[in-house]
Design a protein with these regions (language model features):
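A short beta-loop-alpha structural element at the N-terminal edge
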Residues: 1-15, 22
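Active-site rim helix/loop that mediates acceptor-substrate recognition in acyltransferases
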Residues: 34-54
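Conserved beta-hairpin
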Residues: 52-70, 126
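Conserved acyl-donor/pantetheine-binding loop and adjacent beta-alpha core of acyl/acetyltransferases
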Residues: 66-123, 130
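Conserved GNAT acetyl-CoA-binding A-motif
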Residues: 115-119, 146-158
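Conserved beta-strand-loop-alpha-helix junction that forms the acyl-donor binding cleft
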Residues: 121-130, 154-164, 179
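Conserved acetyl-CoA-binding loop-helix of GNAT-fold acetyltransferases
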Residues: 131-144
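Conserved active-site alpha-helix within GNAT-family acetyltransferase domains
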Residues: 136, 148-150, 159-176, 180
Length: 199
């Protein structure tokens, strides 16, 4: 995998926008309507920019998969982050959905740890390249990297059929949130080796 730079923004946003085109969790956040795909693209641009500020972005070597990771312990209020928040509010979610989105984020945070961790915000593969192992390879590389850095990995998915796939990669279910749809919070703890190495 390759750690992305801003020059990879267009490719990353394209991969994620196509991958999450019909995702329930994304639909919950955006305004919807005839401009829904523009809104999805705006959401992915926002997530990319936030992870470049307060996390990491990785693209597979073949440029077919992308992952956005937020490191919450690095997150802070800056003029840039405020600008991004305002932009996403007007171009993606809208005022009417603000309350729902904030309540969802608060509910998710209730099941995230107080200690340092990595939040796998988005992991996507180009639709025509799915089920070929590209996502599995990237996820395995990511979790191995964060395990070496002593960071458990948390993520959310609204795709029930993906739960067995995540389980094969060592993730366990933390909580199922009911938000008009099911949102599953998953985690992958440190391996025993890396847990002992940290102590």
């Amino acid at each position: 995998m390759i750690e992305a730079t801003y020059s990879d923004r267009k490719s990353a946003v394209q991969i994620l926008s196509k991958s999450f085109d019909s995702n329930k969790s994304v639909e919950y956040v955006i305004k919807g309507g005839p401009k829904r795909r523009t809104q999805i693209r705006a959401l992915m641009e926002y997530a990319f920019d936030m992870c470049m500020l307060f996390g990491e972005v990785y693209i597979s070597d073949d440029k077919k998969a992308c992952a956005l990771i937020l490191l919450p312990y690095k997150k802070k209020l800056t003029l840039k982050s405020i600008e991004l928040d305002i932009k996403i509010l007007f171009f993606c979610s809208g005022i009417k959905k603000l309350s729902k989105v904030l309540k969802r984020e608060e509910a998710i945070r209730d099941f995230h740890p107080e200690n340092k961790y990595a939040h796998l915000w988005f992991l996507g593969v180009l639709p025509q390249e799915q089920r070929k192992g590209y996502g599995s390879k990237l996820l395995a590389e990511l979790t191995a990297s964060y395990s070496k850095r002593h960071l458990p990995v948390y993520l959310e998915t609204s795709t029930r059929s993906n739960l067995p796939w995540y389980a094969r990669h060592g993730f366990t279910l933390v909580k199922e949130l009911r938000l008009g749809y099911s949102l599953f919070i998953l985690k992958k703890d440190l391996t025993l080796y890396h847990a002992f190495a940290r102590n």
